[in-house]
Amino acid sequence: MTYRDVASKSVLIWACTAVGSRMPVAMAPLALVFLVRERPGGYTLGAALAAAYVIGEIIGAPVLGMRLDPARGRRHLVVGLLGGAVAFAGLGVLPGAHPVVLGAFACGAGFAPSAASGGLRTLLTSLVPERAVAQALSIESMLMSGVWAVSPVAVAGLALGIAPRVPLLLAAALMAASIAGLWLLPARWDKDGPDGETGESKLRVLIRAWPVYVTGAASLTLLGLAELTLPALLEQRGIAVGWSGPMLAGLAVGAGCGAFLYGLRTWPGRLRTRSVVFMCGMSAFVALAALIPGPAGIAVALALGGTLQAGAVITRNLSLRETLPPGAIAAGYSVMYAAVGAGYAVTGSLAGTLLQVVAPSTAILAGVALGLLLTALGWWGEVRGEARAKASSTAGDAGDDTGAGLGARAEGAPVARRGDA
């Protein structure tokens, strides 16, 4: 079980496709701000467009994710990515349009391809042996860390160096190119056929996995608050705000390193236990970043926090695979994506509110407390769910034994008898 198990032409094609579909997502919020910043009230409008984009993602991920059919996976992903490419192109071609029109394009750009993340992750795990799923998810995490590290630099360079519309036109081109990549990959990800179906509605199955979503949202909520309040924290410490960029880049590098390290070996303990350990460690490092006075210490703490966050994210994705039947995994990833997006949106509001009444360091510590609370809630939910499942299984076994006994006593009786039903 090493990274050699995932080294294949299909995984390489998947990686290129994933970059094409995910880089526009990473570019979008900042690109929307640059698109309209020269208008009167441009920054306010840019923030509103970015919010419309995020709202589209949060709504679209669960709505479209629940409609993902493993047997027709490629068709669904192509339609979503095509819609996203058209919306991004509309923003780039019509930068001077009425704000309502731009808002509609922004919302559509977030909504249409929002299920692609879950679908592509499920497709990736279908391309590798079952024993190498953790390594595949580690590779995905490393890849996405790189995408999120490069995207802001690319947006700023293109918008300021060429034209504000160029990042959005590039986003449209990348998303369209990812559609071409999908045609080189399997059309479906239910390679073993439909199994694990119980007749229970997909919605109920997905709701049952709520503890995993809560813990997943907690991981990004915690680091999201640290990211958003970092410039204010540096000002509080008397450190140049310009250091925030390199520090956040270090956080992204730490996340990539953490993902690589996670895939190097099999880790002991249950998935939920590992998740709690990663979350508590990450919380400790974020708290240290809030308390350490020097820039070097803050940078190291954030990098180590990012390293542990990667482990927490991969563990949550593995937990989702363990919790859901195969036919609902892609939808589960999409719901997780929406939960994380909602958590990040709430984090932004929380950061803005807290910074008006408390010091930045206190705001970060409040975020740590919230993250630990959500982690505890998710852990409790998983323990409770497992206990219920065991109780149900025990009751079912008892019923089977009773039925078997009745059947033995009624041997030779008509089929209509209860023992033979």
Show the residue positions of the predicted features:
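Hydrophobic core of transmembrane alpha-helices in multi-pass small-molecule transporters
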Residues: 19, 99-115, 217, 298-311
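C-terminal transmembrane helical hairpin of 12-TM major facilitator-type secondary transporters
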Residues: 272-313
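Helix-loop boundary and gating motifs at the non-cytosolic
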Residues: 1-56, 203-249
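C-terminal ends and interior cores of transmembrane alpha-helices
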Residues: 82-97, 281-293
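Helix-to-loop junctions at the C-terminal end of transmembrane segments
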Residues: 59-73, 159, 257-271, 355
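Cytoplasmic helix-loop-helix junction between adjacent transmembrane helices
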Residues: 105-146
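Intracellular juxtamembrane helix-capping segments at the cytosolic ends
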Residues: 32, 114-128, 230, 311-324
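A late C-terminal transmembrane helix in Major Facilitator Superfamily
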Residues: 327-358
